[in-house]
């Protein structure tokens, strides 16, 4: 009678220190992979939250156009917007013909100075040229236009400068060439970003044009 040969018993693997370390490494790798996948999935799901938002500006309400005659200055008069306030220059109390046109809602003002002409008109024109040249260092561009009003003997130049950091985006001078010389300049009480302030600058430009067109000597 033949007997079936018995299979030899295979010894069970003994869990040694090396096997335990390998198992721990495998579990760590699996856990790390799960964490990475979860982080990627969360990042993709919230991707829209990290997109940069478009730049915006505060809305600026512009007042209605209306003007009144300013006739309290000794040497000249003009029409001024009703939303503005004309005040004497606080830093030059002895100069009765120096005024500020204050625009508090825009945090700006137009400074107007007056000088008498006694054969020295070229000196005043040179001063204007020097001041404009200083501002040009921060300007991207400059444009100017002649002012000619033969009826009221008002002649001059209007100067406009573009660019961030320009201290005065608009200035002008007026003269009758024999007795009077007036210079005006727009300033803001903060460092303006002229790009974002462009609607206000354009609005004030219209008021300066009106001031020049209604300017008269006394």
Go through the PLM ranges and name each one:
Residues 1-4, 13-46:
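Sec-dependent bacterial lipoprotein signal peptides
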Residues 25, 42-108, 121-127, 133-134, ...:
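N-terminal targeting sequences that direct proteins away from the cytosol to non-cytosolic compartments
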Residues 36, 107-110:
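Short, charged/polar, Gly/Pro-enriched secondary-structure boundary elements
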Residues 126-183:
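Signature of long, low-cysteine stretches enriched in small and polar/charged residues
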Residues 3, 104-106, 115-117, 162-165, ...:
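Short, flexible beta-strand-to-coil junctions
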Residues 113-118, 127:
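Extracellular-facing segments of soluble proteins and assemblies that are Gly/Ser/Thr-biased and enriched
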